[in-house]
């Protein structure tokens, strides 16, 4: 008889609250076979992460296991399966399992790693706690595991702090910490949600490789069906604390039965959606958008050309090599970026983390001063240099160009009510009376599909999707022409993401807004954008209408980005072998005529109407 590594039966988890007990997980049952990957799928709040916490017995104090069993059959010994649900959460038995035989990769590596200790100390500590080794042996093992998970300089990683690492390297450090003890079960809770698409593909490939080497079982918690299609052997779908469908990956993707799973699949943005086709969220948001522009906004003159244009923007940052050395090095974050945003259209700006996307948006907002280049804004009276604006003109520009932030949890002041959040921009710009502002706040809530009775609530009482709608409402308060959207849906699960994307489209159609939409998710950008600019290492490397770009990508970096997107179609798997060999983000490794070396910017050249690609200067001269 083949006993599963982990067998959960009739698990219930209860939370205490002021109004009584709440059952977050109800009668959950599933198995994790030895050496296999099981994906636990569902929206935020479905009980996925709480289940993982119960397996490790790290539930919050207000929660308890209300019933059921969690049987763990450790292949390292001949003992009968151990029921984790009956163990003392503070006892020696669970402490030996936790981080030793059962390890976990958490969703946000920056908050999971201590900022006060080097990653070398944190990774080696796991082995010191669970293995009979000396400090020197633990550090040697840490170097080995850093090399295995892809650190470019494993020895230097020993003395590196988390804040010195990119998001991808932080997640690799978390994987190293989990794997150094060679666990039998690895629980990965949304391990790639915060990562860009190429880094995500690398992390997924790394997890597959390491799982095969160690014959480890993987419990993958995610809401990304593209990741599930490329990683899972078995899938368990949760909704409101219960399993609604479970089975082999191929059965669920080809023959989904439950309406919830079918709805989850319809909410995922897909490439080549038909013009005008909408995402189908699990729960529709009814908003009252039409006829909400004021008379003053309707009377504004419209620009004849681009509403916003950037030309040859450059920005560099000087970093110190150490506190006392005095040595510095210059980082070129943005190199000759030129963009044009048409009225009522969406320009998608895509690329990996650190490529300069957010720096460009900050310069457009005048939060950063460029080293060179210009940004012009046309409010209907002709283009004006944004960096020359002062006084009332600058205030008018800030009113016309608003920002929607990435993180809906940290971008709203927790000490302000919804009414105060929505009316603060009106108060700062001295718009309307107190009664006018109150009416405007109610209108804004209705526009984003929230009840006007929420005005006296605080941000903590809202879900992530509701908070992001509040962020959009705040950005709309001053009736802007342009919204700069910096990864506005990356922190949201797929069904809430569909609500926000549909809302942004509806607002644009009704209010004539222009969007600069910054994202690393190409499927999302394909859904919402009209034109797409691809950015790498501070350069715009390709720009085209979205249909052209996805049908005929020319630049090798664009091709690599598209190849790294996990598709929720099991007939279109990721080519992990090709992704591993590509040096797609290094301009010096690009083939001719795209290669950029020695600080060369190259030049954008048009290869068909509206389709531009960056090539070397020599190639451009030959073409001329």
Predicted regions, residues:
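Conserved ABC ATPase "signature" region
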Residues: 137-156, 381-382, 436-453
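Conserved ABC ATPase signature
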Residues: 160-165, 169, 458-462, 466
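ABC ATPase C-loop
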Residues: 173, 178-179, 470, 476
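Conserved signature/switch motifs of ABC ATPase nucleotide-binding domains
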Residues: 99, 163, 180-181, 460, ...
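ABC ATPase "signature
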Residues: 243-247, 255, 540-544
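ABC ATPase NBD Q-loop/coupling interface
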Residues: 69-96, 134, 205, 374-396, ...
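A short, proline-enriched helix->beta-strand linker immediately N-terminal to the Walker B motif
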Residues: 180-184, 477-481, 497
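Charged, flexible cofactor/metal-binding loops and thiol motifs
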Residues: 77-83, 249-307, 320-325, 546-623
């Amino acid at each position: 008889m083949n006993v599963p590594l982990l067998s959960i039966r009739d698990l219930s988890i209860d939370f205490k609250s002021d109004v009584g007990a709440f059952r977050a997980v109800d009668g959950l049952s599933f198995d994790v076979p030895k050496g296999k990957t099981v994906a636990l799928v569902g929206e935020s709040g479905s009980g996925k992460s709480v289940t993982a916490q119960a397996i490790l017995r790290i539930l919050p104090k207000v929660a308890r296991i209300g019933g059921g069993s969690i049987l763990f059959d450790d292949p390292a010994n001949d003992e009968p399966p151990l029921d984790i649900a009956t163990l003392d959460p503070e006892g020696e038995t669970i402490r030996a399992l936790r981080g030793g035989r059962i390890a976990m990769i958490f969703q946000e590596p920056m908050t999971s790693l201590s900022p006060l200790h080097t990653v070398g100390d944190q990774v080696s500590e796991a082995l010191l706690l669970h293995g009979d080794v000396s400090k020197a042996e633990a550090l040697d093992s840490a170097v080995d595991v850093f090399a295995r998970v892809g650190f470019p300089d494993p020895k230097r990683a020993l003395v590196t702090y988390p804040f010195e690492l990119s998001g991808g390297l932080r997640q690799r450090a978390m994987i190293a910490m989990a794997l150094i003890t060679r666990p039998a079960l690895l629980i990965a809770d949304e391990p790639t949600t915060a990562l860009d698409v190429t880094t995500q593909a690398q992390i997924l490939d790394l997890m597959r490789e390491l799982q095969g080497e160690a014959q480890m079982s993987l419990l993958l918690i995610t809401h990304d069906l593209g990741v599930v299609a490329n990683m899972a052997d078995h899938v368990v779908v949760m909704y409101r604390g219960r399993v609604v469908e479970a089975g082999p990956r191929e059965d669920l993707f080809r023959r989904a039965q439950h309406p919830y799973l079918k709805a989850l699949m319809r909410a995922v943005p897909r490439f080549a959606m038909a013009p005008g086709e909408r995402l189908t969220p699990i729960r529709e948001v009814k908003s009252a958008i039409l006829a909400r522009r004021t008379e003053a906004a309707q009377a504004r003159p419209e620009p004849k050309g681009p509403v916003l244009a950037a030309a040859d923007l450059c920005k560099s940052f000087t970093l110190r090599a150490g506190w006392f050395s005095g040595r510095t090095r210059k980082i070129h974050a943005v190199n000759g970026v030129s963009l044009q945003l048409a009225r009522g259209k969406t320009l998608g700006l895509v690329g990996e983390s650190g490529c300069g996307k957010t720096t460009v948006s900050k310069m457009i907002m005048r939060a950063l001063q460029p080293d060179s280049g210009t940004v012009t804004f046309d409010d209907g009276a002709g283009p004006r240099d944004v960096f020359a604006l002062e006084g009332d003109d600058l205030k008018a520009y800030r009113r016309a160009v608003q920002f929607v932030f990435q993180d809906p949890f940290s971008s709203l002041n927790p000490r302000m009510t919804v009414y105060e959040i929505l009316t603060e921009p009106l108060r700062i710009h001295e718009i309307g009376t107190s009664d006018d502002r109150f009416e405007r706040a109610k209108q804004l809530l209705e526009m984003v599909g929230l009840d006007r009775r929420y005005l006296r609530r605080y941000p903590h009482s809202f879900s992530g999707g509701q908070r992001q709608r509040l962020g959009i409402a705040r950005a709309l308060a001053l009736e802007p022409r342009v919204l700069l959207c910096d990864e506005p849906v990356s922190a949201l699960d797929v069904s809430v993401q569909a609500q926000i994307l549909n809302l942004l489209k509806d607002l644009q159609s009704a209010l004539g807004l222009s969007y600069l939409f910054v994202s690393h998710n190409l499927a999302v950008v394909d859904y919402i954008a009209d034109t797409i600019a691809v950015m790498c290492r501070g350069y715009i490397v390709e720009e085209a209408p979205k249909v052209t770009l996805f049908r005929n990508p020319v630049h090798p970096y664009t091709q690599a980005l598209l190849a790294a997107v996990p598709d929720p179609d099991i007939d279109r798997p990721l080519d992990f072998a090709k992704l591993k060999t590509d040096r797609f983000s290094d301009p010096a490794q690009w083939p001719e005529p795209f290669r950029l070396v020695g600080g060369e910017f190259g030049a954008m050249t048009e290869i068909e109407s509206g389709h531009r690609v960056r090539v070397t200067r020599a190639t451009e001269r030959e073409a001329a």
